[in-house]
């Protein structure tokens, strides 16, 4: 195949057929701001989009601006009271006497702060994932991408882990209108708890999560958590340790997913590509390269099953942009040049100005013995599944409605935290070389400072450089 400006063409797959790729992007997504010092920065999506454009990948994409999901769309999963709260809360309303009680009730305020435009941000994220599902349902695309989605921690009636609305659950519910079985795969460093919980009692959705397990947010995803009732054995959890590298990850991902595809035979697949599993992430503990991360997408693409690709975590924002740009290239079937094209954020990718970065020399605490034990345990679990469970087609698919807790309990019970509010960036900067103050991977949030030194960049939302370099 001929190469073009976007890179070297790749084989489309075992069938030799090119993939039609739909790409959802909301131009205002980078304007939303969680607040000073907060690790979650929607601006990373704009940076990824800039790379996608400058690599000319847009020429191979059908680009759509998502329709904003409305309250009724979001209410297909989330409780009416919670949706009403998200629609009405604002920084200006925080002085209302009832605000403090509702913030506690819905777990909003620290990990998940109230910021300007919060509900529109949620509507854009959810609208992109629902729109991606509609494209797949109508057979208008083979792969549908929404890097603004993948917010996997949100629950029916509460925010969690920087996530307010679970766009993934909403997208899967849309897919279930047309597809009998949907496979959800999560490669974020954090367990995909919100999605697993939503579908824990049904066999129409199988959830598979590869994540750091132990003293780490959200503290769920034990290998023995396998689902319940009709969904028993349709939740697969792959608990991992610090330092997971490309070779180790691939040695688990490929055989396990191959077995899942063989046994479950999904009619559609959703892949959450949280980039906090990359080497050097500020909140992550793994050591994956961009290519190692993208190998998961490459493997799933080869099956030629309708595929939704979503974003997720990722807090070293220049590496998030690199990763999601490269994975967009994998989706369309090209291998882009490692040398970055000049773009608005070019200086943020220094000093190497390359698409790929080397993993760190950190120790891989996942021993061969542990890996073999996990692989054998999960393959045995998969061997016991009924092949391709048949279901009566339902226009309203089953969603696990977790029992509402008494409001007093909701206000007082401790909530897990993904990030301590006392842990901040150096001078609230976006210098990706520096970890979060007060954050330690193995123990989660701490109060000790992890690094010292002056910052190279002091902008929470990096400003694009509109002036090209002089020749």
Curated annotation (Swiss-Prot):
A single GO molecular function, which one? zinc ion binding
Effect of loss of the gene: Curling and serrated leaves. Down curling phenotype on both the distal and lateral axis.
Region (Histone deacetylase) residue ranges read 20-333
List UniProt keywords, sorted A-Z.
Acetylation, Chromatin regulator, Hydrolase, Metal-binding, Nucleus, Repressor, Transcription, Transcription regulation, Zinc
The record's listing under Gene3D superfamilies reads: Histone deacetylase domain (3.40.800.20)
Induction conditions: By jasmonic acid and ethylene.
Location of N-acetylmethionine modifications:
1
The record's free-text note on cofactor binding: Binds 1 zinc ion per subunit.
* Regulation (activators, inhibitors): Inhibited by trichostatin A.
Q: Where is this site: Polarizes the scissile carbonyl of the substrate?
A: 315
- What does the record list as GO biological process? chromatin organization; embryo development ending in seed dormancy; post-transcriptional gene silencing; regulation of timing of transition from vegetative to reproductive phase; response to abscisic acid; response to salt stress; seed maturation; vegetative to reproductive phase transition of meristem
Q: According to the UniProt entry, which residue ranges have a biased composition of type Acidic residues?
A: 453-463
Question: Which is a Gene Ontology cellular component entry for this protein?
Answer: Sin3-type complex
In terms of InterPro entries, this protein maps to:
HDAC_PDAC, His_deacetylse, His_deacetylse_1, His_deacetylse_dom, His_deacetylse_dom_sf, Ureohydrolase_dom_sf
- A Pfam cross-reference name: Hist_deacetyl
Q: Give cofactor(s), names only.
A: Zn(2+)
Location comes to: Nucleus, Nucleolus; Nucleus
> According to its UniProt entry, what is the function of this protein?
Responsible for the deacetylation of lysine residues on the N-terminal part of the core histones (H2A, H2B, H3 and H4). Might remove acetyl residues only from specific targets, such as rDNA repeats or complex transgenes. Histone deacetylation gives a tag for epigenetic repression and plays an important role in transcriptional regulation, cell cycle progression and developmental events. Histone deacetylases act via the formation of large multiprotein complexes. Required for rRNA gene silencing in nucleolar dominance.
On subunit structure and binding partners, the annotation says:
Interacts with Coi1, which functions in an SCF complex that recruits regulators for ubiquitination. Interacts with AHL22. Interacts with AS1. Part of the AS1 repressor complex composed of AS1, LBD6/AS2 and HDA6. Binds to EBS and SHL. Interacts with MBD6. Interacts with HDA5. Interacts with FLD.
Instruction: State what protein this is by name.
Output: Histone deacetylase 6
Provide the organism lineage as a comma list: Eukaryota, Viridiplantae, Streptophyta, Embryophyta, Tracheophyta
This protein's encoding gene: HDA6
């Amino acid at each position: 195949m001929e190469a073009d400006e976007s890179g070297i063409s790749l084989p489309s797959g075992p069938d030799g057929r090119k993939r039609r790729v739909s790409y959802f992007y909301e131009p205002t997504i980078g304007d939303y701001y969680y607040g000073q010092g907060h690790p979650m920065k929607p601006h990373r999506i704009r940076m990824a989009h800039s790379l996608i454009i400058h690599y000319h990948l847009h020429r191979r994409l059908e680009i759509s601006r998502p329709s904003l999901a409305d309250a009724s769309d979001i209410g297909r999963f989330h409780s009416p009271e919670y949706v009403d709260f998200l629609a009405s809360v604002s920084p200006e309303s925080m002085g209302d006497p009832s605000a403090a009680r509702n913030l506690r009730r819905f777990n909003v305020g620290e990990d998940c702060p109230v910021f300007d435009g919060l509900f529109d941000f949620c509507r854009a994220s959810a609208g992109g994932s629902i729109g991606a599902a509609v494209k797949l349902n109508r057979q208008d695309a083979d792969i549908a991408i929404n890097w603004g989605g993948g917010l996997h921690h949100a629950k029916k009636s509460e925010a969690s882990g920087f996530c307010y609305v679970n766009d993934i659950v909403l997208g899967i519910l849309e897919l279930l209108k047309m597809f009998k079985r949907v496979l959800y795969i999560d490669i974020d460093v954090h367990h995909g708890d919100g999605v697993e919980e939503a579908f824990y009692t049904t066999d129409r959705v199988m959830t598979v999560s590869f994540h750091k397990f132990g003293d780490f947010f959200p503290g769920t995803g034990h290998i023995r958590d396998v689902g319940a009732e009709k969904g028993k054995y349709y939740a697969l959890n792959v608990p991992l340790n610090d330092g997971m590298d490309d070779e180790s990850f691939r040695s688990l991902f490929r055989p396990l997913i191959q077995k899942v595809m063989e046994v479950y035979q999904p009619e559609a697949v959703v892949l959450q590509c949280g980039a906090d599993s990359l080497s050097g992430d500020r909140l992550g503990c793994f050591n994956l390269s961009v290519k190692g991360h993208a190998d998961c997408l490459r493997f799933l693409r080869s099956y030629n099953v309708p595929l939704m690709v979503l974003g997720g975590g990722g807090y070293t924002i220049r590496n998030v942009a690199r990763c999601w740009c490269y994975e967009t290239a994998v989706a369309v079937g090209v291998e882009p040049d490692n040398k970055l094209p000049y773009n608005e954020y070019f200086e943020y990718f220094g000093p190497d100005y390359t698409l790929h970065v080397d993993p760190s020399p950190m120790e891989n605490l996942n021993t061969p013995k542990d890996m073999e034990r996990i692989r054998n345990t999960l393959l045995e679990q998969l061997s016991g599944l009924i092949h391709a469970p048949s279901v009566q087609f339902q226009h309203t698919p089953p969603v696990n409605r977790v029992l509402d807790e008494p409001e007093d309990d909701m206000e007082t019970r401790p909530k897990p935290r993904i990030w301590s509010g006392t842990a901040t960036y150096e001078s609230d900067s976006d210098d990706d070389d520096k970890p979060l103050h007060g954050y330690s991977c193995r123990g989660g949030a701490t109060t000790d400072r992890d690094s010292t030194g002056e910052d190279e960049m002091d902008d929470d939302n990096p400003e694009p450089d509109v002036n090209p370099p002089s020749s």
